[in-house]
UniProtKB/Swiss-Prot annotation:
SUPFAM superfamilies: Class II aaRS ABD-related, Class II aaRS and biotin synthetases, TGS-like, ThrRS/AlaRS common domain. Residues 1-61 form the TGS domain. The keyword Metal-binding applies. GO terms for molecular function: ATP binding; metal ion binding; threonine-tRNA ligase activity; tRNA binding. This is Threonine--tRNA ligase. Its EC number is 6.1.1.3. It comes from Escherichia coli O139:H28 (strain E24377A / ETEC). Homodimer. HAMAP family: Thr_tRNA_synth (MF_00184). GO terms for cellular component: cytosol. Belongs to the class-II aminoacyl-tRNA synthetase family. Zn(2+) binds at residues 334, 385, 511. It catalyses: tRNA(Thr) + L-threonine + ATP = L-threonyl-tRNA(Thr) + AMP + diphosphate + H(+). The gene is thrS. It comes from the Bacteria.
Length: 642
């Protein structure tokens, strides 16, 4: 009979099979009330599942990440329960958990309106407030199929026929008269599912195949308590205000149009930000001793066949033909960099060779996935490739890590999650080579005092990698930086150098990206700063305004002076009230507004205001220039007097 070992090491002995709920009740009524599920020997199980042998058990509650995921999954079933009550002829497809919530794909003979969604959410709340028990039943494949066939649930029947073995025992979960099928686990009672909201609807093809029927996907979010739900909804509200597409239009940074899906039309102010970002990256490339190169944006298909990209990536590549030759527009820069490396004989003394490029890349992303600057078809990669010996890997990875943190800190990103992906089952190279490579990456992270977690088996077949995910002010994750070792591509493309022993050797290649895509990173920055770009990045850094025509000459003189000092400045001499001008440039997020009246002309000074509405008073023009130059030069995130 089972001996149950709890997380604190204590044990409980039973003379019969017990469930996680039984053990929770044995510990105390409070834990039993909070029990959502159990983790038995590392595997999640329902609170009612029986444990027949000795096992390690953790009780899962709403405070656990697993508990929250189970709540969300059960809310998907709750949605199914409600929609079948409102529209009984609905056919249910799939209802998985996603980040922050869940969705359900349904086949319904009407297009859901906003009023329908509100009615559906209301019915879900009515059902959840009944606090009914969720009953689990393990049945044979044949019984499960008969159950759903009798209910007309053709999509569930299809899942059983195509995805579940005949000797398997599917789990059926009964919500009163409604039944759903799932691996589970699910909540034991609907009292855990009170804090949710339906968010939106969208179209989705059955099984993601455009040849199949279009279903309606209903998205929802769910949380353990009301406070967490409200906090999430507030974050969404703030995110909507910061949407880079909205701000990009307000600030006239760029636009997209139907004739070039996923391609960016940069306007003057947006392109100014892009070029300033390039200047910043170039300054770091120089500091960290990189060469900058430029490769062609398309190359013969034969080369992409050699690299393996054609076999594994051709659906995402644009192609064109000329004179009976097929060319691929590059989706990445690495093959071109190997071609540059291959020009001329290389010695071990030439290594490491660090090669960077602002490469114009194109990928044929599905039209439905395109999203402003965040997901495009044409983009600029800030990546680099380092050619080195095996002995140099650790030092080079160290340099990459320092560069990543150096650049991210400039923008104020402090929360960065790091993951190290290790060897997959299918891979090239010896175990000894992988041992050394993985150890080099781990030691480099440890030497920089960077906590990280392993992603076992998640590396590419050609080498392990480090991923850097930064979190913005709304705690959203953005995976931007990577350091990837490559033992394959140099060999495929015949790259070599002469070693100390005068023998030809294949270099190790390190793929390194920090911002990832320049376009996407500008989108991230736009939302991070809500359009209030730090002064060094702002398209227009200063606007100088007159109050009446009598100050026009003074304004023009100052405008020229600031421009000569390297400051991006504009004069506003319009015949408008000064309050109107200030409001307009404040909405344009211009960092500084200099106001000139008769008093300023007489004294040779300017009245300084910030876009946040702070009045810095009257200041000497040379003092303003000096302070602005210092703020811009240091790439400060703060404005004067902050």
């Amino acid at each position: 009979m089972p001996v149950i070992t709890l997380p604190d090491g204590s044990q409980r002995h039973y003379d019969h099979a017990v469930s996680p709920m039984d053990v929770a009740l044995d510990i105390g009524p409070g834990l039993a009330k909070a029990c959502i599920a159990g983790r038995v020997n590392g595997e999640l199980v329902d609170a009612c599942d029986l444990i027949e042998n000795d096992a390690q058990l953790s009780i899962i509650t709403a405070k656990d990440e697993d508990g929250l995921e189970i709540i969300r999954h059960s809310c998907a079933h709750l949605l199914g329960h409600a929609i079948k009550q409102l529209w009984p002829h609905t056919k249910m497809a799939i209802g998985p958990v996603i980040d922050n919530g869940f969705y359900y794909d349904v086949d319904l003979d009407r297009t859901l309106t906003q009023e329908d969604v509100e009615a559906l959410e209301k019915r879900m709340h009515e059902l959840a407030e009944k606090n009914y028990d969720v009953i689990k039943k393990k049945v044979s494949w044949h019984e499960a199929r008969e159950t759903f066939a009798n209910r007309g649930e053709s999509y569930k029947v299809s899942i059983l026929d195509e995805n579940i073995a005949h000797d398997d025992k599917p789990g059926l979960y009964f919500h009163e008269e409604y039944v759903d099928m799932c691996r589970g686990p699910h909540v034991p009672n609907m009292r855990f599912c009170h804090h949710f909201k339906l968010m939106k609807t969208a179209g989705a093809y059955w099984r993601g195949d455009s040849n199949n029927k279009m279903l309606q996907r209903i998205y929802g979010t769910a949380w353990a308590d009301k406070k967490a739900l409200n906090a999430y909804l507030q974050r969404l509200e703030e995110a909507a205000k910061r949407d880079h597409r909205k701000i990009g239009k307000q600030l006239d940074l760029y636009h997209m149009q139907e004739e070039a899906p996923g391609m960016v039309f940069w306007h003057n102010d947006g392109w100014t930000i892009f070029r300033e970002l390039e200047v910043f990256v170039r300054s770091k490339l120089k500091e960290y001793q990189y060469q900058e190169v430029k490769g062609p944006f398309m190359m013969d298909r034969v080369l992409w066949e050699k690299t393996g990209h054609w076999d594994n990536y051709k659906d995402a590549m644009f192609t064109t033909s000329s004179e009976n030759r097929e060319y691929c527009i590059k989706p990445m820069n690495c093959p071109g960099h190997v071609q540059i490396f291959n020009q001329g004989l290389k010695s071990y003394r030439d290594l490491p060779l660090r090669m960077a490029e602002f490469g114009s890349c194109h990928r044929n992303e599905p039209s439905g996935s395109l999203h402003g600057l965040m997901r495009v078809r044409g983009f600029t990669q800030d990546d680099a490739h380092i050619f080195c010996t095996e002995e140099q890997i650790r030092d080079e990875v160290n340099g990459c890590i320092r560069l990543v943190y150096d650049m991210y800190s400039t923008f104020g990103f402090e929360k960065i999650v790091v993951k190290l992906s290790t060897r997959p089952e299918k891979r090239i190279g010896s175990d000894e080579m992988w041992d050394r490579a993985e150890a080099d990456l781990a030691v480099a992270l440890e030497e920089n005092n960077i906590p990280f977690e392993y992603q076992l088996g998640e590396g590419a077949f050609y080498g392990p990698k480090i991923e850097f995910t930064l979190y913005d002010c709304l705690d959203r994750a953005w995976q931007c930086g990577t350091v990837q070792l490559d033992f394959s591509l140099p060999s495929r493309l015949s790259a070599s150098y002469v070693g100390e022993d005068n023998e030809r050797k294949v270099p190790v290649m390190i793929h390194r990206a920090i911002l990832g895509s320049m376009e996407r990173f500008i989108g991230i920055l736009t939302e991070e700063f809500a359009g209030f770009f730090p002064t060094w990045l702002a398209p227009v850094q200063v606007v100088i305004m007159n109050i009446t025509d009598s100050q026009s000459d003074y304004v023009n003189e100052l405008t020229q002076k600031l421009s000569n000092a390297g400051i991006r400045v504009k004069a506003d001499l319009r015949n408008e009230k000064i309050g109107f001008k200030i409001r307009e440039h404040t909405l344009r997020r211009v960092p500084y507004m200099l106001v000139c009246g008769d008093k300023e002309v007489e004294s040779g000074k300017v009245a300084v205001r910030t876009r946040r509405g702070k009045d810095l008073g009257s200041m000497d023009v040379n003092e303003v220039i000096e302070k602005l130059q210092q703020e811009i030069r240091s790439r400060s995130l703060k404005q004067l007097e902050e």
